[in-house]
Amino acid sequence: MAIAETLKVAVAANFKPTLEDLAEKFEQETGHKLLISAASTGILFNQLVNGAPFDIFLSADRQRPGMLKEKGMILPGSQHTYAMGELVLWSPGESTTLVELRDNKARLAIANPAIAPYGLAAQQLLENLGIWSYVESRLVKGASIQQTWQFVVSGNVPVGLVAKAQMVDGDQYTVMPYEYYDPIQQDMVILKRTQHPDAAKQFVEFILSESAQSLIESHGYFSVVKKDKDGSLIEKALIDKAPIDRARIDRARIESTLIKD
């Protein structure tokens, strides 16, 4: 009988609620438990580089897992995309648009672009829509997308660019056009320092399984795996989520997309 292990998992703040649900299913299927620590991707990356004893890292981008790979800190072949995030504009109790926000004096909450991938995506969106210069002085930056959400839900900031996965039934929000920010492609890796490589590999296989991906989709993310002809799961080509082609940004479409009648 296999020994049940406890895996220490560093997870981007936006994915923590989803991971908590996944952890229950993973324990039911394998007996292994997860000890979850959540923060912004940038903070977790710095902790890992400085020797934090995690087995697995679930990032909100693919750049930092790639940097860990370049440093020789991950198990070979362990980097996989597990989800794609999506930005929404959210103002509790009333709907708004970015163009309306541009023209009024309301503060806007975003995650800190320097350490949080959702914040970088928000900055790209605002810059490519020509709105950044109007709202920059009114930005309130959270240390993570979770803190950004808390700014808005508490009423301290009236509107925010947050993750779709943070919305619940009944929330009114506007999905931002993904053409205007680079894909929020969330990757995971197994750290080379892990003392539980077999259990960690089981976790990666579980996250990429059809049942886990269905749960991830139900939490507001895009699934990034599909079944191959032989029934095995493979990562999708992200053709419809390609990086921004800034030369093709259509200002007329911006107005028609974001201004209400």
Q: Where do the model's predicted regions map?
A:
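Exported/periplasmic ABC-transporter solute-binding proteins
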Residues: 2-29, 35-38, 42, 46-52, ...
